[in-house]
Amino acid sequence: MPKRVLQGVVISSKTDKTVTVKVERKFKHPIYKKFVKVSKKYAAHDIENKYKEGDKVSIVESRPISKTKTWVVLNLE
């Protein structure tokens, strides 16, 4: 089964080896036919602490690293 890859923006890099990535997606509401923007935050593993706030990154699913971390930063976009 292929791993999911998401694109988002780093909104926090205060913790050691972890960044918080905000991923936004747009979809059309089934009843109102209006495009709705929904965002979700993911904790991603950053081994080298090289990503800063505002960076656009790709994250990929991985094995559980901690209680809330199951994503790893793949690369900078």
Swiss-Prot record:
Protein name (database record): Small ribosomal subunit protein uS17
Highest taxon in the source lineage: Bacteria
Alphabetized GO MF terms: rRNA binding; structural constituent of ribosome
Entry's Gene Ontology cellular component terms: cytosolic small ribosomal subunit
Keyword set includes RNA-binding: yes
Keywords: Ribonucleoprotein, Ribosomal protein, RNA-binding, rRNA-binding
Native organism: Rickettsia prowazekii (strain Madrid E)
One GO BP: translation
Family: Belongs to the universal ribosomal protein uS17 family.
UniProt cross-references to PANTHER family, sorted A to Z: 40S RIBOSOMAL PROTEIN S11 FAMILY MEMBER (PTHR10744), SMALL RIBOSOMAL SUBUNIT PROTEIN US17M (PTHR10744:SF1)
Subunit (UniProt): Part of the 30S ribosomal subunit.
Pfam families documented for this protein: Ribosomal_S17
InterPro entries reported in the protein's UniProt record: NA-bd_OB-fold, Ribosomal_uS17, Ribosomal_uS17_bact/chlr, Ribosomal_uS17_CS
Function (record text): One of the primary rRNA binding proteins, it binds specifically to the 5'-end of 16S ribosomal RNA.
HAMAP family with a match to the protein in the record: Ribosomal_uS17_B
Gene3D superfamilies: Nucleic acid-binding proteins (2.40.50.140)
PROSITE patterns cross-referenced by the UniProt entry: RIBOSOMAL_S17 (PS00056)
